Swiss-Prot record:
Quaternary assembly: NDH-1 is composed of 14 different subunits. Subunits NuoB, C, D, E, F, and G constitute the peripheral sector of the complex.
Primary gene name: nuoC
Enzyme class: translocase
Record's protein name: NADH-quinone oxidoreductase subunit C
Lineage: Bacteria, Pseudomonadati, Pseudomonadota, Betaproteobacteria, Nitrosomonadales
Cellular component GO terms held in the UniProt record: plasma membrane
């Protein structure tokens, strides 16, 4: 969006959400608002229903693990001790505006947020994806189950502390004639052999 359109949207947001605790930043032609998890549903409904905003479409939703970050936005808000966040990308078809919402989850051990399916139905599979990959639980989701990994998958593969090789591996067992799961058997190995050259190797004789 152009700066004038972003400024207009920012003004509308400040007026409509004046009674809410909202941190706003403008970077790369887009607005981002940082809100508290307890205010998520109220603000989401306002963003959708208020005629000056009319964010009727949820374009994307994703989880983020900030455990290895020092800041949480391009503008440099301090991350504090909250590890997980959920980011929402909204579109207003009526006004042709876009908005990003970032919400940090309070509990690092059992991350949980309210589902926004009843506000934006397109959140359904996005919330399932964040649950599957990050382990973020969405309250009142009608069908919260894994969507990308298998049902017996252990852990959440997009968390920063998830091992690169995983925990289990899958292979076909010719004796049982079916696919089986077993603990990973990957071992550290040296792909390029270590070669010790003899002294004076490559030096021209005189």
């Amino acid at each position: 969006m152009t700066d004038s359109r972003v400024d207009k949207l920012a003004t509308n947001l400040q007026q409509v959400l004046s009674d809410q605790q909202v941190d706003m930043s403008h970077a790369l032609g887009e607005l981002t608002i940082l809100i508290h998890s307890r205010d998520l549903l109220g603000i989401a409904e306002t963003l959708r229903n208020h005629t000056d905003l009319a964010f009727d479409t949820l374009v994307d939703l994703c989880g983020v693990d900030y455990s290895e970050y020092t800041t949480n936005t391009h503008a440099g808000y301090k991350r504090g001790d909250k590890r997980f966040a959920v980011v929402y990308h909204l579109l207003s078809v009526k006004h042709n505006h876009r908005l990003r919402i970032r919400v940090f989850v309070d509990d690092n051990e059992f991350p949980m947020l309210d589902s926004v399916i009843h506000i934006w139905p397109s959140a359904n599979w996005y919330e399932r994806e964040a649950f599957d990959l990050f382990g973020i639980v969405f309250n009142n989701h009608p069908d919260l189950r894994r969507i990308l990994t298998d049902y017996g998958f252990i852990g959440n593969p997009f968390r920063k502390d998830f091992p690169l090789s995983g925990h289990m591996e899958m292979q076909y067992d010719p004796e049982q004639k079916r696919v089986i799961y077993q603990p990973i058997t990957i071992e550290p190995r040296e792909i390029t052999p270590y070669i010790i050259r003899e002294e004076q190797y490559g030096k021209e004789e005189t």
